[in-house]
Amino acid sequence: MKTVSALCLVAAFLSAEASAVTVVGNAGTLGANGVVTLPPTGDPSYGWVSTNGGAPGGGLPYILPGINGGIGNTNGSTLRSDLFAANAGDNLQFYFNYVTTDGAGFADYGWARLLDASNNEIALLFTARTKPSGSIIPGFGMPAPSATLTPAAVPIIGGAPTWAPLGISSGTCFTTGCGYTGWVQADYSIVSSGNYVLEYGVTNWSDTYYDSGLAFSGSTIAGAPINTETTVPVPAAAWLFGSGFTVLMGAVRRKSRA
């Protein structure tokens, strides 16, 4: 498994043509692992972002007003694609799989956004966040997706998910709502011609215990690949740093919730 882990912005230059994927926090590529199978695109690997090893505040750059009094991000990770050109009417397509070990009132969330060349938001394509029942897209307190999803309803596949990017949280679950979505297809029609960036992200909400992640694959525009691959390897120990502290603080959190 290749990882990119940092507490500041890093650029992974992917070719001699100055194309770049930018990462905040912890991201990488991986093959079939735990509950995350190979993507339906047939690719031998997929990209991922995880709150494990995430950067402080590394979530959406704004607080969604419907989330329990407006409490915001604590830590998280984002990955932004290389800049790509698109014409009005072009179809943006990708696949994602949201995985979480945190539930109940502390549910984390993942998302994808379409940004312009200056990184201004054009569309919040989807958000995924656990809720007591029904589709977790959108989750509680979240806006409706701008992208069309297949399947349209996305319930959580419950249980304590095992997945390496979750670090020490893999195989654990805080109360109800843990699990994964399985692979979901997203499609979005570009409104105006221009240059764009595709962003994937995941964040811890309210605290930093019990991690979540987002796998993604098959990012294309009008059928042409969008570069989202990270290529700068970081030893696994780097993104597992602090695991013992996480276990200790997780125990404190469980006690405080009792």
List the model feature ranges, each with a label.
Residues 255-258:
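Short, charged juxtamembrane terminal tails flanking transmembrane helices
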Residues 5, 230-233:
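Serine/threonine-rich, low-complexity intrinsically disordered segments
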Residues 6-9, 25-27:
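Short helix-onset patch at the extreme N-terminus, typifying the N->h transition
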Residues 2-8, 237-239:
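Sec-dependent signal peptide recognition
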Residues 233-252:
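A short, hydrophobic C-terminal helix/tail in secreted or cell-surface proteins
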Residues 21-229:
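Aromatic (Trp/Tyr/Phe) and Gly/Pro-enriched flexible surface segments
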Residues 13-17:
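N-terminal signal peptide c-region/cleavage motif recognized by signal peptidases
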